[in-house]
Amino acid sequence: NTSYAECSVSPEWLNLQEFSTWCTSQPLYNKTVLGRRTALDKDLLIPNNKVYSKEACLIIPEEINKALVGKRKTGKDRGLPCGIFKHGKKFITYRDSDKRFDSFSTLEDAARDYQQKKEGRIKGLLLKYGEYLDSVTIHALQEFTIKSRSIYN
C-alpha cells in the first residue's frame, strides 16, 4: 500500500518483545467493540505522523480508524484534497449518511463541506464508542479537526 511508503517504525518497536508488551498493555488490544475489530492507529494523537511508536499510537475501534483516513483518489482527481472529486465543472463530496453525493461550484465550498462532514462523523463515532475508550483517545477525538491535518495526500 503506497500510503505507508513514507512510514517507519521506532527503533524500540523493532524489538518484537517491546512491541508485544505495549500491545498487550492496551485496553482494546485484540478486542471487539460493538461487534467491530480494533486497529493500530498512528496519527490520531500526532496529525500526519509517519512513525509507529508508543508515543504516537493507539488501539482504537477499526470503524474510527477508517473514518480518520481520507477517501482515496482516482488518477484524474490528483491535486484535490481527500474526499473531493471533480465531475465536469463541479466539485463533489460524498455523503456517508445516505451514500449520496453533494456538488459545489467552488473547491472552497466543497472543502468546507468535506471538513464539516468529516468532523461530524468523528464526533458521532465518539458518541457511539465513547464508553469503551480511554481518556487519551477521547480527548484526541474531541480535538480532531481537519485543519490540523494534511488533506492533500
Spans of features found by a protein language model:
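A short, exposed loop/beta-hairpin motif centered on an aromatic-Gly-Thr core
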Residues: S8-P11, S97-E108
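Extended, polar beta-sheet/loop recognition surfaces of beta-rich domains
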Residues: R121-N153
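An aromatic-rich alpha-helical recognition segment common to small helix-rich domains
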Residues: F19, I84, T93, F104-K118
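Short beta-strand motif preference
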Residues: K90-D96
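Amphipathic alpha-helical interaction segments
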Residues: P27-N30, D109, I122, T137
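The canonical J-domain HPD catalytic loop and its flanking helix-turn segment that engages Hsp70
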Residues: K42-L44, E119-G124
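Short, cationic Gly/His-enriched loop motifs
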Residues: T2-K89
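Generic alpha-helical secondary structure signal
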Residues: C23, A56, S105-E108, K118, ...
